[in-house]
Amino acid sequence: MKQDRFLVGILVGIAVLVVVALAVFFTRRGTQAYIADDVPEGVVHNYVLAILNKNYEKAYGYLADLENKPTYEQFRDAFIKGVVNPNNSAIDVGKSEINGDTASVEVGMIYNPSDPFSTGYRDVQHASLIKQESSWKLSSMPSYYFWDYSWYQEPPK
């Protein structure tokens, strides 16, 4: 009889832990929010979040108006067709360094492991921004998960 109560207690404890874990999982999902984009790191954060939310129009608004800028259709199609695929990585936006009308933002790329026995890895690079009409705009991002390297490149002749 004591063993039955003990077993029931263990099972109830496990059930409570499972319910708590599920509650935490579902309440934490989607808690990312847009932040002020008056600083370079805010622009990078909001660009990445817009891409992850598939809000390509908002993300496109963060691109600098430079020569050979992709059209909105080219930009959107790169994500829709999978040329640029952000699903296998995450970004940690770090500090920015501003020098006049240019800025560099530390971007930590966090890559998922390719199999269950590997660990992911982190690679720190920098996004480049320029100030246009008093707003910070992206001129390059270090990752092909969020940026197509053909953007802003002169087309081949």
Language model region names:
Residues 42, 46, 56-106, 110, ...:
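Short solvent-exposed beta->alpha transition segments
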Residues 1-2, 136:
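The identity of the second residue at the extreme N-terminus of proteins
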Residues 2-53:
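Short, low-complexity N-terminal intrinsically disordered segments enriched in polar/charged residues
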Residues 98-157:
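Exposed beta-sheet edge and beta->alpha loop/turn motif
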Residues 34, 38-42, 50-54, 66-73, ...:
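Soluble non-cytosolic domains of exported or imported proteins
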Residues 13, 36, 81-84, 113-117:
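Intrinsically disordered, low-complexity segments enriched in polar/charged residues with Gly/Pro
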